[in-house]
């Protein structure tokens, strides 16, 4: 637990959250286009 406590988790969570948004955006658009939905 000492190693985890030494790391600053806030920037890691922020980078992970931004990464998920950047990945989820194109995925949602691809799924809508794959289903033939009009944007």
Curated annotation (Swiss-Prot):
Keywords: Membrane, Photosynthesis, Photosystem II, Thylakoid, Transmembrane, Transmembrane helix
Coarse class of the protein's main subcellular location: membrane
Transmembrane portions of the chain: 12-32
UniProt keyword annotation of Isomerase present: no
Subcellular location per the Swiss-Prot or TrEMBL entry: Cellular thylakoid membrane
Any GO BP: photosynthesis
Signal peptide: none
Membrane topology annotation: Single-pass membrane protein
Function as written in the Swiss-Prot or TrEMBL entry: A core subunit of photosystem II (PSII), probably helps stabilize the reaction center.
The protein's assembly and partners: PSII is composed of 1 copy each of membrane proteins PsbA, PsbB, PsbC, PsbD, PsbE, PsbF, PsbH, PsbI, PsbJ, PsbK, PsbL, PsbM, PsbT, PsbX, PsbY, PsbZ, Psb30/Ycf12, peripheral proteins PsbO, CyanoQ (PsbQ), PsbU, PsbV and a large number of cofactors. It forms dimeric complexes.
Protein name: Photosystem II reaction center protein Psb30
């Amino acid at each position: 637990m000492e190693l985890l406590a030494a790391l600053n988790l806030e920037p890691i969570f922020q980078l992970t959250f931004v990464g998920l948004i950047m990945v989820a955006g194109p995925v949602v658009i691809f799924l809508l286009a794959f289903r033939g939905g009009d944007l």
